[in-house]
């Protein structure tokens, strides 16, 4: 048997006599800084976000209000600036816009030039300006001389050994007399036979040609009286005084010098005069 001392017996009795305490569950756990840090940071962030949102809203409202105030302020001062500009403009233009005379009751307005009382009166200056405007010098338009073609139905014979000279003279004659009839001969040996077969109002001959030159043709024409009513014109580069005298002795009526730098009127009138003079001799 186990022996128990009085102290142990007393302790056992006290334990058995006292009611059993209900078992307690310890729900508290060990809590440290690292476990609560995430929670604290989340709470802090949410609070700062709400504060920042509120501050942003306040700033936007304040910005809109300041923009509106700035706009109204600018509008107000812009209108004031415009009024000031108009006032300054009026002050600058008034002395030049309205001019009065001390000894006259009338008012004269000169928007361009100020009035000088020592030289002329405003009334005289206005009258002189009006008269100068009315009496502007009218420059006459240049007079162009229009050459009208002659519609006479002439018949011409052109004799030249150079085909280019033939074409040039042919073109000029058609400009002068659009209804004329022209025969061109490059071989001067054919002229005599053609003159016996066909009549012409005038013949245009070159002087320097091979075989039969212009002097030979002129002498042949003037020896036959039936050609007296036909005009004869020399078209040549020979224009000395001796040559012109020789042409006249051979019965050539007129000489055009090459190149043909004559006005159309001069050539047309010269040809008309030659033909009319020859026809009137008969």
UniProtKB/Swiss-Prot annotation:
This is Stress response regulator protein 1. Residues 155-273 form the Response regulatory domain. Required for stress adaptation, morphogenesis and virulence. It comes from Candida albicans (strain WO-1). Residues 12-31, 41-84, 112-139 are annotated as: Disordered. The modification 4-aspartylphosphate is found at residue 206. Residues 12-30, 41-58, 125-139 have a biased composition (Low complexity). GO terms for biological process: filamentous growth of a population of unicellular organisms in response to biotic stimulus; phosphorelay signal transduction system; positive regulation of filamentous growth of a population of unicellular organisms in response to biotic stimulus. CDD domains: REC_hyHK_CKI1_RcsC-like (cd17546). InterPro entries: Bact_response_regulator (IPR050595), CheY-like_superfamily (IPR011006), Sig_transdc_resp-reg_receiver (IPR001789). Keywords: Phosphoprotein. The keyword Phosphoprotein applies. Residues 66-77 have a biased composition (Polar residues).
């Amino acid at each position: 048997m186990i022996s128990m001392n009085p102290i142990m017996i007393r302790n056992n009795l006290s334990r058995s006599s006292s009611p059993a305490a209900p078992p307690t569950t310890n729900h508290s756990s060990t809590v440290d800084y690292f476990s609560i840090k995430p929670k604290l940071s989340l709470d802090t962030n949410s609070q700062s976000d709400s504060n920042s949102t509120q501050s942003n809203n306040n700033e936007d409202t304040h910005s809109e209000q300041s923009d509106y105030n700035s706009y109204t302020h600018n509008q107000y001062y812009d209108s004031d600036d415009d009024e000031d500009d108009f006032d300054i403009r009026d002050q600058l233009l008034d002395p030049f816009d309205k001019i009065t005379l001390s000894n006259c009751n009338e008012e004269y307005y000169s928007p361009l030039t100020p009035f000088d009382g020592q030289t002329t009166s405003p009334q005289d200056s206005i009258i002189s300006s009006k008269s100068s405007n009315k009496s502007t010098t009218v420059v006459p338009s240049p007079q162009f001389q229009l050459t009208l073609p002659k519609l006479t139905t002439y018949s011409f014979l052109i004799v030249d050994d150079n085909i280019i000279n033939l074409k040039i003279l042919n073109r000029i004659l058609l400009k002068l007399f659009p209804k004329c009839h022209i025969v061109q001969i490059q071989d001067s040996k054919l002229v005599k036979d053609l003159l016996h077969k066909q009549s012409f109002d005038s013949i245009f001959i070159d002087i320097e040609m091979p075989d039969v030159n212009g002097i030979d043709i002129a002498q042949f024409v003037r020896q036959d009286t039936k050609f007296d009513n036909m005009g004869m014109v020399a078209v040549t580069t020979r224009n000395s005084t001796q040559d012109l005298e020789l042409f006249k002795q051979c019965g050539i009526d007129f000489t055009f010098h090459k190149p043909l730098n004559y006005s159309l009127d001069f050539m047309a009138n010269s040809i008309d005069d030659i033909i009319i003079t020859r026809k009137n001799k008969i």
